Amino acid sequence: MAFDIPSLKDSVHPDEWQLRVDLAACYRLVALYGWSDLVFTHISAKLPHSVAGDDHQFLINPYGLMFDEITASSLVKVDMACNKLHDSPFPVNPAGFVIHSAMHEARPDAGCVLHTHTRAGVAVSAQAHGVLPISQQSTFVLASLAYHGYEGVAIRDDEKTRLQADLGQAN
C-alpha cells in the first residue's frame, strides 16, 4: 500500500534526520532478513541529546505499516508518556510503546531497541528451558540473556516494571 507521507527532512534537526534514515534502513534490513512478524515487532531509537535535550524521546514504527514500507518520515517521535511529538497520520503501536519505553527507561545507555520474532527466537522461547549450554554459540549469550514470561500482548503500563525487572543488569 502506498502512503503520501511528506518528507520531514527540512523540518527536523539534522541529527534527528540521520537517526530517522538509519532507523528506517534498519527496518528494511529486518524485513529483508525475514525477522519481522507483520506489525507485531518493533524497533526504536533514542533521540540524541542534541535533539531532545534532557527529555527522553524515541522514534518507533507507525502502527499499521509493514517494515518494508517504513521510511524516515513515517517514523513516529514520542516521549515517555506516549505523546506524539510531531504531526503524524499514524497511531503509535501500544505494545511497541510499552515495551520500548520500558527498555529505554531502564537502559538510558541503549541507543536502539529491537524486538523481533525470528524463527530461532520463537523456537527457543517455546522451550521450557530456553537456551541450553550445549554449544559454544549458546554459551556466548547465556551471561547476558534475560527472560520475560509471556503475559499476552504488552499493552498495559503495569507490565513495564516487570519487563525492567526481568531485563536486569546483564543486558
Positions of predicted regions on the chain:
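Glycine-rich flexible loops
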Residues: 1-171
